[in-house]
Amino acid sequence: FGRLLSVRRSQTRGKEGPYLLFLLTNSRKCMRREGYIIEEIVEYSNMSEAFEAVLRGTDRKESIQGKKLLAHREEVISKLTAAIENGSFQLGGYHETEIKEYGKSRILQILSMHDRIAVYAVMNVVDRHLQKRYIRTTGASIKRRGTHDLMHCIRTDLQKDPEGTLYAYKFDIRRFYDNVQQDFVMWCFRRIFKDERLLVLLERFVTMLPEGISFGLRSSQGAGNLLLSVFLDHYLKDKYGVR
């Protein structure tokens, strides 16, 4: 059957259970854990970038929240920096709205802009460290990747090895965010990071909802990619040589 081309993937989800427990207990690949991540997060340049990113666009700047934040920009950055640095930052709640995307209805959790600045600052650094661990064809929510980049990779493989790419397995994971098991996500984060202050913050993001991970929280994009990277991508590539 030649080489299997794994085409991935819209972030929807399927069943955990015994299969993932098997992967969890049989994971043999050791990773060197990284520390001192909080120090990178609280650098002024990163906190300032997070502030600007969350308040981009006229509508956000002209909103009640936006005007208040802009009027106290340096104070907001200073307080959020301190809260992240000492590990005391807590999400202050959210409201929900229903959106339709690709023919599906989804419930989106929306944080205050204030909290989004902190989450953005944390994940801006965390994502940079996580992306080094992903396989080349991980593309969801990653700058300069995505659908077009993945299509280029597929076309290149098809041209270089027509016989080896004769067969492919395309699949989807149903309701990914809704059904993710939070303890699996945190196990993955702990496998990569040893900074306890960071892990406390990440756990607060992951457990914001009673079950699953938030569809509207930026951290969920990285958490989803990481979960699939550990339990699917590297498992298939490292154990079975799937290309």
Language-model segment annotations:
Residues S105-I135, P210-D238:
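Conserved pre-motif C helix in the palm subdomain of viral-like polymerases
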Residues R73-K104:
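Active-site-flanking structural segment that lines cofactor/substrate pockets
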Residues F1-S78:
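Non-catalytic, polymerase-adjacent accessory regions of viral genome-replication enzymes
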